[in-house]
Design a protein with these regions (language model features):
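Extended, hydrophobic interaction surfaces within ordered domains
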Residues: 24-86
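OB-fold and OB-like beta-barrel modules that bind single-stranded nucleic acids
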Residues: 4-11, 55-67, 82, 98-105, ...
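Beta-rich strand-turn-strand
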Residues: 44-69, 146-180
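Acidic, gly/ser/pro-rich intrinsically disordered tails
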Residues: 1-5, 13-20, 29-33, 37, ...
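A beta-hairpin/wing motif
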Residues: 23-27, 121-124
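Short, charged/polar low-complexity linear motifs in solvent-exposed/disordered segments
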Residues: 78-79, 173-174, 185-187
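Generic structural detector for well-ordered beta-strands
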Residues: 9, 39-41, 102, 123-125, ...
Length: 229
């Protein structure tokens, strides 16, 4: 599971390096931070609103989040709509993400966790339906950088282990380091909205050497409405 529901502002249209049309929107920041840029791949499910929008239009969007595997070094977030995009009369502060998958720590997580005792950074590896335009296959995984705080961070530290299945609800956050043209998008866990499944600890000698358990995540197949136009 890798879904986003959010209010957003229409920014404009463009094409990827391999010629795929997208519509860029800005999702409002929660608290401090920048608006989050998301690129929408138009689908039948989205309806025809995106064809008549002007810059600054307020939208309600919903769908699955992906990365673009077709272009190396493309770190943008892409949304495949699963429901009709609505035109709103005013901006709404909605930014909700649900991610389910396998717990994982990469080198950046480990480094970040050394600087704070109240924060725990980790990665969730999840699966998603095939999206040929983004070169995403059923066997591919999508990684989401996640930040948890205080009680949630402590609980995850005590009960999570590599490969353990979990589900979180949170919001997208964007951060661009000083002097950099590239921003980083992560998910921040909302207080108390994290659940883990399966055994709390691995059995002795059963350590996971690679994130193979992602395949255990249940995937809902895409409908005809989710297919790109």
């Amino acid at each position: 599971m890798n879904t986003l529901k959010a209010g957003a502002t229409y920014v404009g249209e463009g094409t990827t390096e391999h010629g795929i049309r997208y519509v860029e929107v800005a999702v409002p920041a929660v608290g401090k931070g920048e608006d989050v840029k998301v690129k929408i791949i138009p689908t039948k499910a989205a309806g025809d609103v995106l064809n008549s929008c002007t810059k600054g239009a307020n939208l309600l969007i919903g769908g699955r989040l992906y990365r673009n595997r077709a272009v190396q070094g493309d770190f943008n977030s892409y949304l495949i709509p699963t429901k009709r995009i609505e035109l709103l009369s005013s901006r709404i502060p909605l930014n909700e993400v649900t991610i389910a998958g396998a717990y994982w720590l990469n080198d950046n997580d480990i480094k970040a966790n050394q600087t704070s005792k109240e924060r725990h950074n980790f990665t969730i590896l999840t699966s998603a339906p095939q999206q040929p335009l983004l070169n995403h296959e059923y066997d591919d995984t999508i990684s989401f950088s996640v930040t948890s705080w205080k009680y949630d961070a402590e609980r995850i530290l005590q009960t999570a282990h590599t490969g353990r299945q979990m589900i979180i609800e949170g919001y997208l956050r964007s951060y661009t380091p000083a002097g950099s043209d590239t921003g980083y998008v992560s998910v921040t866990v909302r207080s108390g909205l994290v659940e883990m499944f399966g055994k709390k600890k691995e059995k002795e000698g059963s350590k996971i050497s690679k994130p193979a358990d992602v395949s255990k995540v249940v995937i809902q197949g895409e409908s005809k409405e989710e297919l790109p136009i």
